[in-house]
């Protein structure tokens, strides 16, 4: 099991849908979140993409310099950059970060945003172009280790003599992650992707998606790894966790929810449609209606696009729900919580000790652990706190 955190380059807050409790985007804060994730033993961080975010490549490059082990899941956008340019960017980042790059292929689903960036392809054509983009990207980086060049003639993209002179450290290329819920997305994942990501739907729905991707992968003689994107709201008691969930959306009003849902309804995204269906387009607002599966809460999606569900509960319950997803075949969990700095600590301290040995070991054996840090404050100048009971 690998646990990732999230860098909130679009801003952060204690509440959704209001400026109350909000934190402005700034590098000092993003650095705090990244260093916390690195220090606490998270495997890596997802850096989001889109017009509401700071540029992920610039942010990742800056954060790589202030972290030691943390991996960076960074977006490439077919249609917005050439595949050979993206290959050079990936190779350079991988080299300067000592092999800490992971690629998140993002086709996009917001028509207004895509058109604002000059991309006017429909859904089917975007996936055709994305498949061609990824074929070129993968081939160019694989060939770079031997100094070879690549020719490719496709419907949307063509290159002749494409090459990268300085290959990435990871062979044949940094691993590719990708999420999508439509049939073309599953086909693309099965053919070319290393790890398929899904947003946090109920386990039965997730299992169906994973099985479909497996079928596509089998046609190409491949196997694909799986990951899930979720928010988390964990507290020492179940009641406290649900109170925190209610508090997160306590500042929302009907107009704010309606305006957000109108934007989502105009998106050309099967994944966003499935997220909206979980809360009936914002019309389900009670805790009972928003708990769409045991401890899986759709309240975040009332106003947040993309990943709109959270696991809510005490540490043991949240850990058990993660194990349920792991039993489906998921081994990468990309998590987040509001505010992201405090919740990175809270999740690591409360849930990491309950996760598989590989995760616990990273948290327990962090370099530089001292008695006055993770073991608590030394009392009366010489009394070390007793060990917690696991």
From Swiss-Prot:
The keyword Flavoprotein applies. GO terms for molecular function: alkanesulfonate monooxygenase activity. The keyword Oxidoreductase applies. InterPro entries: Alkanesulphonate_mOase_FMN-dep, Luciferase-like_dom, Luciferase-like_sf, SsuD_RutA_monooxygenase. GO terms for biological process: alkanesulfonate catabolic process. Keywords: Flavoprotein, FMN, Monooxygenase, Oxidoreductase. This is Alkanesulfonate monooxygenase.
């Amino acid at each position: 099991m690998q646990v990732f955190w999230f860098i909130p380059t679009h801003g952060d807050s204690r509440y959704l849908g209001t400026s109350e409790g909000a934190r402005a985007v700034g590098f000092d804060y993003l650095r705090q979140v990244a260093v916390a994730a690195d220090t606490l033993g998270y495997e890596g961080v997802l850096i989001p993409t889109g017009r509401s975010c700071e540029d992920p490549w610039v942010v990742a490059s800056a954060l790589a310099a202030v972290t030691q082990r943390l991996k960076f899941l960074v977006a490439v956008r077919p249609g917005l950059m050439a595949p050979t340019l993206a290959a050079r960017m990936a190779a350079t980042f991988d080299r300067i970060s000592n092999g800490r790059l992971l690629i998140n292929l993002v086709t996009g689903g917001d028509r207004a945003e895509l058109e604002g960036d000059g991309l006017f392809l429909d859904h089917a054509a975007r996936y055709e172009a994305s498949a061609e983009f990824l074929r070129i990207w993968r081939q160019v980086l694989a060939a770079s280790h031997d100094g070879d060049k690549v020719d490719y003639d496709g419907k949307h993209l063509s290159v002749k003599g494409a090459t990268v002179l300085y290959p990435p450290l990871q062979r044949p290329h940094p691993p590719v992650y990708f999420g999508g819920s439509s049939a073309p997305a599953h086909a693309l994942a099965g053919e070319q992707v290393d790890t398929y990501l899904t947003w946090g739907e109920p386990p039965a729905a997730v299992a169906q998606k994973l099985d479909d991707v497996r079928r596509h992968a089998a046609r190409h003689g491949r196997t694909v790894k799986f990951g899930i994107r979720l928010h988390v709201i964990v507290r020492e008691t179940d009641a406290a966790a649900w109170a925190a969930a209610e508090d997160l959306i306590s500042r929302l009003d009907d107009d704010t929810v309606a305006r957000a849902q109108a934007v989502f309804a105009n998106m050309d995204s099967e994944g966003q449609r499935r997220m909206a269906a979980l809360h009936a387009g914002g019309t389900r607002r009670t805790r009972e209606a928003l708990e769409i599966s045991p401890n899986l809460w759709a309240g975040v999606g009332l106003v947040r696009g993309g990943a709109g569900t959270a696991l809510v509960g005490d540490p043991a319950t949240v850990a058990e729900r993660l194990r349920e997803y792991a039993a489906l075949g998921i081994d990468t969990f990309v998590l987040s919580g509001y505010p992201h700095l405090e919740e990175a600590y809270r999740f690591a301290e409360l849930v990491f000790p309950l996760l598989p040995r590989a995760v616990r070991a990273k948290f327990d054996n962090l370099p530089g652990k001292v008695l006055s840090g993770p073991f608590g404050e030394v009392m009366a100048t010489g009394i070390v706190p007793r060990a917690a009971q696991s």
